[in-house]
Amino acid sequence: MNCYLILTVALLLTSAMTGTTTAGQLNKKGVTLREDDGFPCNAGNCACLPLDSYSYTCQSPTSSTANCEGNECVSEADW
């Protein structure tokens, strides 16, 4: 019984210490990307990660970024 407990704890610690994010990789600004790492918006738009969501929304670069994480909308060049 104790072996199963030790094995479970070891697996959980290994998983926690790998430093991976749930969505995969990070871009150069530290924003969590989608699994495919492709820019999610059409050319000319920027990707905003809303404060209350895990999915990016696309918007015009001139739109307000008040609801975006880090108060920024990431352009395709910065993705």
UniProtKB/Swiss-Prot annotation:
Signal peptide: 1-23
Tissue specificity of this protein: Expressed by the venom duct.
UniProt keyword annotations, A-Z: Disulfide bond, Ion channel impairing toxin, Neurotoxin, Secreted, Signal, Toxin
Record's function text: Probable neurotoxin with unknown target. Possibly targets ion channels.
One CC-aspect GO term: extracellular region
Disulfide-linked positions: 41-58, 46-68, 48-73
Comment field on protein domains: The cysteine framework is IX (C-C-C-C-C-C).
Subcellular location, record wording: Secreted
Protein name: Conotoxin Cal9.2a
Gene source species: Californiconus californicus
GO molecular-function terms, A-Z: ion channel regulator activity; toxin activity
Maturation propeptide residues: 24-33
